[in-house]
């Protein structure tokens, strides 16, 4: 498959998608663009919130989308770097893909450091796919309390944090592995529909997951997040390995020009946010370095500088589209009804017709578990985790001492969703990621992990079982003898073990450092390689069939359901759920700092156990932090969870997870 993928996609992905598109369209009038917005079920009147404020329901109009594209194109024209420009709304609907005359057809993914490419390293992918992924990244990583760019993403996914030649020895980025989320195969992420009530339902998938290549920014109107812009002009789709220098990146400058008038508030940009004492990076470009693009108009831009183009599976219109307002029924994310979740601050994911996509329910795994989770237990787990979140001090939000905002997902041992809930303004990326985390904790804690991996048709995937067993010195590893939180599995998924310690071998679920970059992480990337290949062939027109809406080729645990249907995740924020010493599920959290995510999942599970008396965290004796690995003569213990200092806004408590 790898050789076929490399030969087919590398040849076909460089093809221009202009032929698929047609000419440029007008922006229309009344803010609607050329494509009318469907009429979904009206959003219920929200109940007043207790702890949070819901974002105003504001959406980009077609005229505004045209203005954003025109400004970016004006910067590209004056700098002599024709570009592909994509705009999305907050839930990932693609509102425009504009190809300037002379823009590159493809974008090259970096080779492996040692030249031995694996997974998607070295491929050339469609420039349109890269631009969309950058736009999605800018929108999905941001919120009303934080504005992150694809340059920010680059900083937090590499083998050292911050990434720089002088930081060897430091641990990996806090969101190491998040680039393999929002995947085109995800069973959670929605897919483009040409019309009907579900046309704008999100969150939508990304063709390449999240991007680490600079040139993607969020878009705001009056401080309200409304979408993202992504640009590809240089023919490369990579990452920035050194934050100590200042790049002249034309993708980034062109995208930044598109945000003029739609800028992120300065107070919430990434460079106002610190993680472990390190200031995050938002952009290497300044607004003062841009050409004056304020007079650019859509009428001057199309067809003079290029045309809108169709992108199969994402954008199939010859006209600009208006976005949908996040929080409205049409967006797929809205305030929960009282009948759906007890806390008045809760938001849920909907189908556009009023129904909650993931209502609270009991476990589906009665054939595998003597006593599956009951609906009452599932309710307790999500309610208690939500309650911890409302008290938690955020790490990545401004102003300081804001409340954490996350998405929380609960699954059974088969990976079936038993409920999902989120705060009103949690970053969108955390939805798919929280589900990945929940499934990952349940998967690696289960008795079936080794058998499932061995049943995958890829010899590469199969080989990770033997690597784990040899590394841990345990021939029974991955058969349910230990409980793995995502932090534990993440320890084994870094190119150095222990994390960041140069000169040490890789964890058994990682690629060696000589081969590693953000485009091949190890088991995580190997599991979805076939899906990515299928999808890129579909996007380029090489195949009439898209990848199924289920990631990985693992065997089914239930009809049409494998245990990792949206992939796996390798940074902290989940724990398995037990009834005594029997695994019954997993809970995942994502959207704030990794210690906050860990605390919400761990304390939420503990508190649910106190409340219902029948479930809880894994017994201490079987947690992965009882596993000790000998490396270079030293004994290294895996980690289970890590909870933050001064975690709560309403209490001076410390060490809140200790002893539980």
Model-inferred region functions:
Residues 30-31:
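Non-catalytic, C-terminal membrane-associated alpha-helical segments of glycosyltransferases
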Residues 36, 42-660:
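Flexible, solvent-exposed loop/hinge segments and secondary-structure transition points
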Residues 16-19:
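C-terminal motif of bacterial Sec signal peptides marking the signal peptidase cleavage site
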Residues 1-9:
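Bacterial N-terminal signal peptides that target proteins for export
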Residues 21-26:
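Bacterial signal peptide processing site
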């Amino acid at each position: 498959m790898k050789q076929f993928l490399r030969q087919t996609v590398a040849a076909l992905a460089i093809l221009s998608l202009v032929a698929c598109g047609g000419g440029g369209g007008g922006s229309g009038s009344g803010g609607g663009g050329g494509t009318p917005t469907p009429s979904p079920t009206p959003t219920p009147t929200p109940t007043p919130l207790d702890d949070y404020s819901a974002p105003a329901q504001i959406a980009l109009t077609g005229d505004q989308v045209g203005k954003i594209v025109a400004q970016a194109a004006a910067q590209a024209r004056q700098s002599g770097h024709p570009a592909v420009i994509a705009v999305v709304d907050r839930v990932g609907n693609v509102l425009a893909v504009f190809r300037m005359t002379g823009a590159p057809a493809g974008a090259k993914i970096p080779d492996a450091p040692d030249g031995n490419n694996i997974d998607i390293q070295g491929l050339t992918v469609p420039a349109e796919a890269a631009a969309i992924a950058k736009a999605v990244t800018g929108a999905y990583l941001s919120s009303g309390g934080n504005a992150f760019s694809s340059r920010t993403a680059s900083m937090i996914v590499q083998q050292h944090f911050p990434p720089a030649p002088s930081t060897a020895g430091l641990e990996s980025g806090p969101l190491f592995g998040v680039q393999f989320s929002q995947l085109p195969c995800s069973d959670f992420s929605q897919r483009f529909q040409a019309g009907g009530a579900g046309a704008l339902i999100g969150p939508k998938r990304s063709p390449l997951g999240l991007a680490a290549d600079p040139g993607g920014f969020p878009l705001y109107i009056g401080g309200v997040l409304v979408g993202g812009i992504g640009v590809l002009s240089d023919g490369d789709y990579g990452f920035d390995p050194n934050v100590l220098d200042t790049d002249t990146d034309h993708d980034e400058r062109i995208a930044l020009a598109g945000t003029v008038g739609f800028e992120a508030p300065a107070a919430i940009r990434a460079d106002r946010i610190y993680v472990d004492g390190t200031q995050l990076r938002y952009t290497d470009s300044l607004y003062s370095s841009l050409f004056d693009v304020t007079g650019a108009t859509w009428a001057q831009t199309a067809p003079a500088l290029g045309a809108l183009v169709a992108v199969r599976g994402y954008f199939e219109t010859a006209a600009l589209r208006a976005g949908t307002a996040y929080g409205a029924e049409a967006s797929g994310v809205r305030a929960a009804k009282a009948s759906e979740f007890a806390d008045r601050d809760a938001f849920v994911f909907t189908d556009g017709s009023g129904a909650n996509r993931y209502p609270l329910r009991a476990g589906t795994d009665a054939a595998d578990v003597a006593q599956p989770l009951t609906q009452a237990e599932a309710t307790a787990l999500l309610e208690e985790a939500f309650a911890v979140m409302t008290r938690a001090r955020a790490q990545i939000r401004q102003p300081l001492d804001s409340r954490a905002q996350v998405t929380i997902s609960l699954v059974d041992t088969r990976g079936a969703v038993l409920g999902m809930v989120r705060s009103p303004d949690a970053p969108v990326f955390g939805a798919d990621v929280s589900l990945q985390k929940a499934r990952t904790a349940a998967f690696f804690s289960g008795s079936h992990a080794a058998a499932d991996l061995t049943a995958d048709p890829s010899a590469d995937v199969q080989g990770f079982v033997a690597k784990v067993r040899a590394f841990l010195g345990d021939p029974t590893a991955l058969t349910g003898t230990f409980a793995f939180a995502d932090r534990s599995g993440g320890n084994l998924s870094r190119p150095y073990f222990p994390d960041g310690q140069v000169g040490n071998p890789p964890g058994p679920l990682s690629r060696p450092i000589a081969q590693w970059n953000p485009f091949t992480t190890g088991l995580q990337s190997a599991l979805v390689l076939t899906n990515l290949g299928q999808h890129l062939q579909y996007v380029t027109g090489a195949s009439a069939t898209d990848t199924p809406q289920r990631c990985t080729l693992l065997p089914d645990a239930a009809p049409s359901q494998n245990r990792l249907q949206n992939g796996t995740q390798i940074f902290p924020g989940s724990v398995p759920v037990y009834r005594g010493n029997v695994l019954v599920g997993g809970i995942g959290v994502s959207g704030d700092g990794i210690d906050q995510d860990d605390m919400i999942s761990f304390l939420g599970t503990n508190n649910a156990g106190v409340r219902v008396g029948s479930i809880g965290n894994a017994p201490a004796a079987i947690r992965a932090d009882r596993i000790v690995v000998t490396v270079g003569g030293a004994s290294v213990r895996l980690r289970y969870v890590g909870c933050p200092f001064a975690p709560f806004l309403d209490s001076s408590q410390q060490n809140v997870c200790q002893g539980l």
